[in-house]
């Protein structure tokens, strides 16, 4: 029989027994009977801290792994986790190369769609890698079609992780400026939100993915990978859909960019030896579409926080990849799809020279200073 998940009421019972000398002498069933009427008389605000504790316990339980011992019998969990992280990164890179190679061999590289995802969060739990989601955005992107569609929503988890209100206020004030729960904007039913998001993302899977039940692969920046992974787990856990928690794989968009660029350069006969992950990472850090108007949600446009809007982020990633790769394939840049609406490009495609942009010498695109 599957073990029951911790819930808010049982978190209250445990706290009551720990703080009440009389309660420590009761069995669990007796304590539950004693606490029932007390719980019924509590307000939603009073119950909030116990809901938060139960939530954190559920998410952390899913993340926990059995500790192993080294030869002297000492826990080597850190080394095990380090090795697992290295293996996961290598597997991710192999998968990205396989995806791009498959599209290239089938002559569909220009049409191959990729999913970009970003999350904003309210706060991070102190005792685990748990981020509480505040905003989600995703978009579909291909080299030929640019950004074909996007999905964006704000999220209201109902309450802040217990004891984290001050940290959440500081984080919001210095980044996305979203109001905190319980006054947060957006979707409150996180289970439905996760199901709707998974459905939207899964629409990009091809027939082979559907046939073999392959996970959905999404891309984000290296800095946001732990945030995106944790926020998806949070939504899946809240919606009681743990069995689908592994349906979404989060990959490095910078490594995708590198793989695409090197592949395209090879296709057009341009040397690609100078390209490496440090080069592609630097372009994403520059983020020269950061101040483009008209690509953020209405709220972040109004409060002047477009840089931190997740919708703006995923669109900017598509624009950056388009800017650095489409010229090599003589793909015309379309406003809203490959570039922001107000940007006008005037470059001429010359296969032998267009890739010089990656060395910082391509200056006929309407931008300067990079």
From Swiss-Prot:
InterPro entries: HMG_box_dom_sf (IPR036910), Maelstrom (IPR024970), Protein_maelstrom (IPR039259). Pfam families: Maelstrom (PF13017). It comes from Drosophila pseudoobscura pseudoobscura. Belongs to the maelstrom family. Keywords: Cytoplasm, Developmental protein, Differentiation, DNA-binding, Meiosis, Nucleus, Oogenesis, Repressor, RNA-mediated gene silencing, Transcription, Transcription regulation. This is Protein maelstrom 2. One of its GO terms (molecular function) is transcription cis-regulatory region binding. The gene is mael2. One of its GO terms (cellular component) is perinuclear region of cytoplasm. Residues 2-68 bind DNA. Involved both in the piRNA and miRNA metabolic processes. As a component of the meiotic nuage, plays a central role during oogenesis by repressing transposable elements and preventing their mobilization, which is essential for the germline integrity. Repression of transposable elements is mediated via the piRNA metabolic process, which mediates the repression of transposable elements during meiosis by forming complexes composed of piRNAs and Piwi proteins and governs the repression of transposons. It comes from the Eukaryota. The keyword DNA-binding applies. GO terms for biological process: germ-line stem cell population maintenance; male meiotic nuclear division; negative regulation of DNA-templated transcription; oogenesis; piRNA processing; regulation of miRNA-mediated gene silencing; regulatory ncRNA-mediated gene silencing; spermatogenesis. The keyword DNA-binding applies. It is found in: Cytoplasm; Nucleus.
């Amino acid at each position: 029989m599957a073990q029951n998940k911790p819930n808010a009421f049982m978190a209250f019972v445990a706290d009551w027994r720990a703080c009440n000398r009389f309660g420590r002498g009761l069995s669990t069933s007796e304590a539950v009977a004693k606490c029932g009427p007390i719980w019924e008389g509590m307000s939603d605000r009073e119950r909030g801290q116990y809901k938060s504790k139960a939530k954190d316990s559920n998410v952390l339980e899913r993340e926990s792994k059995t500790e192993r011992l080294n030869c002297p019998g000492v826990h080597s969990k850190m080394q095990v986790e380090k090795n697992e992280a290295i293996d996961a990164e290598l597997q991710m890179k192999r998968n990205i190369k396989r995806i791009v190679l498959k599209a290239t061999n089938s002559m569909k590289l220009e049409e191959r769609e990729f999913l970009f995802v970003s999350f904003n969060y309210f706060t991070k739990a102190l005792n685990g890698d748990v981020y509480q989601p505040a905003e989600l955005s995703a978009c579909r992107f291909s080299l030929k079609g640019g950004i074909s569609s996007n999905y964006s929503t704000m999220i209201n988890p109902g309450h802040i992780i217990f004891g984290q209100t001050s940290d959440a206020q500081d984080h919001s004030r210095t980044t996305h400026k979203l109001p905190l729960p319980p006054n947060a904007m957006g979707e409150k039913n996180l289970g439905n939100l996760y199901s709707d998001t998974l459905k939207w993302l899964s629409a990009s899977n091809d027939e082979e993915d559907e046939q073999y039940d392959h996970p959905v692969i999404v891309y984000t920046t290296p800095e946001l990978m732990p945030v995106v992974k944790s926020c998806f787990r949070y939504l899946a856990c809240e919606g009681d859909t743990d069995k689908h928690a592994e349906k979404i794989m989060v990959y490095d968009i910078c490594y995708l960019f590198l793989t695409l660029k090197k592949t395209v350069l090879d296709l057009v006969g341009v040397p690609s030896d100078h390209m490496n992950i440090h080069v592609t990472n630097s372009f994403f850090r520059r983020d020269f579409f950061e101040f483009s108007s008209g690509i953020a949600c209405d709220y972040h446009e109004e409060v002047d926080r477009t840089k931190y809007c997740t919708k703006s982020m995923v669109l900017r990633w598509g624009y950056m990849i388009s800017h650095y790769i489409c010229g090599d394939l003589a793909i015309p840049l379309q406003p809203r799809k490959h570039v922001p609406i107000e940007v006008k490009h005037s470059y001429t495609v010359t296969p032998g020279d267009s890739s010089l942009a990656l060395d910082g010498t391509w200056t006929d695109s309407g931008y300067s200073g990079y």
